[in-house]
Each structure stands twice: as C-alpha cells, then as structure tokens.
C-alpha cells in the first residue's frame, strides 16, 4: 500500500503543464499551470508582467481564440505548447478606407 503514495505524487506532477506565451515582438514568457486551471489566470499574469491590459490583446492557440474559461485540458494542450498573443486592432486600415472610397 505504501507504494501508491509515490504514484499520487507523479500524478500531481503530471497535473501541471508548461506553456509558452509568444508576443508579436518575438518575446516568450513561460508559465507553469495546472491542466484544469482556467487560462484567465495565465492571461492576467501575462498582462501584468508585460504591462498590458486584457482589452488590448487577444490570445490564440493553434489559430483559435482562447476564452478566459478555457483550460489547457479542454484545449488538449501539451507540455511546452505555445500560445500566441496579438494586439487587438481597432478601427479600419487606410488601405481598406481607400479601397472602399474608390468603389472597389
């Protein structure tokens, strides 16, 4: 029976996952998070560390937006996976305005 305790310890260790958060500037920040912890915790910690507002940026994994309630387990994330961070764009671009204005 005493052999089961180390197995529990291994299970606890496997409950954590190391994730990388990659910014558009090439910076990478690493986080260790439990597989069933909402990613909002990681997102808020990243914003605090980088001096950003949650309203300024968007997080994506495998090209799909991440919701604050998503967990690594739900998104089937694996150890050392990368989350991409993008600054939210506000308004239209000059090119789009020019194209729309020209009737194209």
UniProtKB/Swiss-Prot annotation:
SMART domains: UBQ. Ubiquitin-like protein which can be covalently attached to target lysines either as a monomer or as a lysine-linked polymer. Does not seem to be involved in protein degradation and may function as an antagonist of ubiquitin in the degradation process. Plays a role in a number of cellular processes such as nuclear transport, DNA replication and repair, mitosis and signal transduction. Covalent attachment to its substrates requires prior activation by the E1 complex SAE1-SAE2 and linkage to the E2 enzyme UBE2I, and can be promoted by an E3 ligase such as PIAS1-4, RANBP2 or CBX4. There is a cross-link at residue 92 (Glycyl lysine isopeptide (Gly-Lys) (interchain with K-? in acceptor proteins)). It comes from Bos taurus (Bovine). It is found in: Cytoplasm; Nucleus; Nucleus, PML body. The keyword Cytoplasm applies. Residues 93-104 form a propeptide. There is a cross-link at residues 5, 7, 11 (Glycyl lysine isopeptide (Lys-Gly) (interchain with G-Cter in SUMO2)). It comes from the Eukaryota. There is a cross-link at residue 11 (Glycyl lysine isopeptide (Lys-Gly) (interchain with G-Cter in SUMO)). Interacts with SAE2 and UBE2I. Covalently attached to a number of proteins. Interacts with USP25 (via ts SIM domain); the interaction sumoylates USP25 and inhibits its ubiquitin hydrolyzing activity. Interacts with BMAL1. Pfam families: Rad60-SLD. The gene is SUMO3. InterPro entries: Rad60/SUMO-like_dom (IPR022617), Ubiquitin-like_dom (IPR000626), Ubiquitin-like_domsf (IPR029071). This is Small ubiquitin-related modifier 3. Keywords: Cytoplasm, Isopeptide bond, Nucleus, Ubl conjugation, Ubl conjugation pathway. One of its GO terms (molecular function) is protein tag activity. Its main location: cytoplasm. GO terms for cellular component: cytoplasm; nucleus; PML body. Belongs to the ubiquitin family. SUMO subfamily. Disulfide bonds: none annotated. The lineage of its organism: Eukaryota, Metazoa, Chordata, Craniata, Vertebrata. Polymeric chains can be formed through Lys-11 cross-linking.
């Amino acid at each position: 029976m005493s052999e089961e305790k180390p197995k529990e310890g291994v299970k606890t260790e496997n409950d954590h996952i190391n994730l990388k958060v990659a910014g558009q500037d090439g910076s990478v920040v690493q986080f260790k998070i439990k597989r069933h912890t909402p990613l909002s915790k990681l997102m808020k910690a990243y914003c605090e560390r980088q001096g950003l507002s949650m309203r300024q940026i968007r997080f994506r994994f495998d090209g799909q937006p991440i919701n604050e309630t998503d967990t690594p387990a739900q998104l089937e994330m694996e150890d050392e996976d990368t989350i991409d961070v993008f600054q939210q764009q506000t308004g239209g671009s000059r090119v789009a305005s020019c194209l729309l204005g020209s009737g194209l």
